[in-house]
Amino acid sequence: MAKNIAKALLDIEAVSLSPNDLFTWSSGIKSPIYCDNRITLGYPEVRNAIRDGLIQLIKEHFSNVEIISGTATAGIPHAAYISEKLELPMNYVRSKSKSHGKQNQIEGAKSENKNVVVVEDLISTGGSSITAVEALEEAGANVLGVVAIFTYGLAKADKTFNKAHIPFYTLSDYNELIEVAKDEGKISLNDIQTLVDWRDNLS
């Protein structure tokens, strides 16, 4: 499954590799990879494969889930597809509380005393995922873990999740993506080393 998802992300250009002309992330980090999984929303076949893959991860690792929770905003549609298929309640978590109305950070199903799985689109450092986890826990939820489409495989993410005692699982990862890109002739051996070095140095 990891290989198929990586191939799909490359084919629809949800993930772009540019070892010699680096992208600039919003954080200012210079990177040879850019991932925008929102592009998957425009491809029903890919979108459904992601939904079914994430459901498989949830059933394997978090079978006692009661609520599916999406991270705002990119995790929300995937959480909606999953909750619809599993016939489970859903909510979503903002990065911070609203400044008006009831000032809710969590919208949708009530999480108190419920087993919740968080759905992310992408894991880089893990910070946004854990922000959502902490908001849910403050609301009384029992967060079982996080599932996501893709991870860069940064050591910092592992540390972030381990510190919070939250397991996470992804459909595909950076190593698988590099392997698929190599097999399809999208990158050279020198490019591979550049990509690996970037990830290792950033970790």
UniProtKB/Swiss-Prot annotation:
InterPro entries the UniProt entry points to: OPRT (IPR023031), Or_phspho_trans_dom (IPR004467), PRibTrfase_dom (IPR000836), PRTase-like (IPR029057)
Binding site for 5-phospho-alpha-D-ribose 1-diphosphate: R94, K98, H100, E120, D121, L122, I123, S124, T125, G126, G127, S128
GO biological process annotation, one example: 'de novo' UMP biosynthetic process
Keywords tagged on the record: Glycosyltransferase, Magnesium, Pyrimidine biosynthesis, Transferase
Binding residues annotated for orotate, in chain numbering: S124
TM segment ranges: none
Cofactor section: Mg(2+)
PROSITE patterns associated with the record: PUR_PYR_PR_TRANSFER (PS00103)
Gene Ontology terms, MF aspect: magnesium ion binding; orotate phosphoribosyltransferase activity
Enzyme Commission code(s) on record: 2.4.2.10
Catalytically driven reaction(s): orotidine 5'-phosphate + diphosphate = orotate + 5-phospho-alpha-D-ribose 1-diphosphate
Biological or metabolic pathway of the protein: Pyrimidine metabolism; UMP biosynthesis via de novo pathway; UMP from orotate: step 1/2
Catalytic class of the enzyme: transferase
Database matches in SUPFAM superfamilies: PRTase-like
Assembly mode: Homodimer.
Function recorded in the entry: Catalyzes the transfer of a ribosyl phosphate group from 5-phosphoribose 1-diphosphate to orotate, leading to the formation of orotidine monophosphate (OMP).
Membership in a protein family: Belongs to the purine/pyrimidine phosphoribosyltransferase family. PyrE subfamily.
Protein name (record): Orotate phosphoribosyltransferase
Native organism: Staphylococcus epidermidis (strain ATCC 12228 / FDA PCI 1200)
Gene behind this protein: pyrE
